[in-house]
Curated annotation (Swiss-Prot):
Post-translational modification comment from the UniProt entry: Conversion of fibrinogen to fibrin is triggered by thrombin, which cleaves fibrinopeptides A and B from alpha and beta chains, and thus exposes the N-terminal polymerization sites responsible for the formation of the soft clot. The soft clot is converted into the hard clot by factor XIIIA which catalyzes the epsilon-(gamma-glutamyl)lysine cross-linking between gamma chains (stronger) and between alpha chains (weaker) of different monomers.
Record's signal peptide: none
Protein's UniProt keywords contain Secreted: yes
GO cellular component terms listed in the entry, alphabetical order: extracellular region
One Gene Ontology biological process: blood coagulation
Name recorded for this polypeptide: Fibrinogen alpha chain
Comment on protein domains: A long coiled coil structure formed by 3 polypeptide chains connects the central nodule to the C-terminal domains (distal nodules). The long C-terminal ends of the alpha chains fold back, contributing a fourth strand to the coiled coil structure.
Subcellular location: Secreted
Keyword Ribonucleoprotein among record annotations: no
Keywords on record: Adaptive immunity, Blood coagulation, Coiled coil, Disulfide bond, Hemostasis, Immunity, Innate immunity, Secreted
Subunit structure, interactors included: Heterohexamer; disulfide linked. Contains 2 sets of 3 non-identical chains (alpha, beta and gamma). The 2 heterotrimers are in head to head conformation with the N-termini in a small central domain.
Function, in words: Cleaved by the protease thrombin to yield monomers which, together with fibrinogen beta (FGB) and fibrinogen gamma (FGG), polymerize to form an insoluble fibrin matrix. Fibrin has a major function in hemostasis as one of the primary components of blood clots. In addition, functions during the early stages of wound repair to stabilize the lesion and guide cell migration during re-epithelialization. Was originally thought to be essential for platelet aggregation, based on in vitro studies using anticoagulated blood.
Amino acid sequence: EDGSDPASGDFLAEGGGVR
């Protein structure tokens, strides 16, 4: 994912999680 949400998205992306 793009990491636009704190709980979903790439953990390397800004504000991203590790879901």
